[in-house]
Amino acid sequence: MARVKTGVVRRRRHKKVLKLARGFYSGRRKHFRKAKEQLERSLVYAYRDRRRKKRDFRRLWIVRINAACRLNDLSYSRFINGLKKAGIELDRKILADLAMNDAAAFAKIAEAAKKAL
C-alpha cells in the first residue's frame, strides 16, 4: 500500500487556524503553532466572557438605577421593593435606560414605588 502524505489536509487545517488568528500580533498571527495556542486561549476567553458579559451589564444597570434612586431620595433595594409592591414590571435594563435618558419618567416611577412602600 502506498504511503499517504497529509499535504492537502495539513494545508487546509493550517489555513483554517491562521484565518481565525487574523488580528493577533506578530508570530501569533503568522506561525501555525503559536497561532493555534493563542487561538485556543482566545476561544476560552470568548466562551467565558459571553457569560461574564451578562453579569457585567446587570451590575452596570444596578449602579445606574441606584444613582438615579438616590437623586429621588430612595435606596435601590427600597425602590425595587416598591416596584414589586406597586405591580410595576420593568426590568433593570429598561429602568437603567430611563434613569440615563429620561429622568422625569424615572422620577414618576420612583414616586409610584415610594407610594407603594
Swiss-Prot record:
One GO MF annotation is: rRNA binding
What keywords are annotated for this sequence in UniProt? Ribonucleoprotein, Ribosomal protein, RNA-binding, rRNA-binding
Supply one GO BP term.
translation
The UniProt entry, under Pfam families, shows: Ribosomal_L20
Q: Does the keyword Lipid biosynthesis apply?
A: no
| Gene3D superfamilies found in the cross-reference section | 6.10.160.10, Ribosomal protein L20
GO cellular component: a single term: ribosome
Question: Which SUPFAM superfamilies did the record assign?
Answer: Ribosomal protein L20 (SSF74731)
The protein's superkingdom reads Bacteria
Please report which protein family the annotation says this sequence is part of: Belongs to the bacterial ribosomal protein bL20 family.
Which function does this protein serve?
Binds directly to 23S ribosomal RNA and is necessary for the in vitro assembly process of the 50S ribosomal subunit. It is not involved in the protein synthesizing functions of that subunit.
Q: What is this protein called?
A: Large ribosomal subunit protein bL20
Gene that specifies this protein: rplT
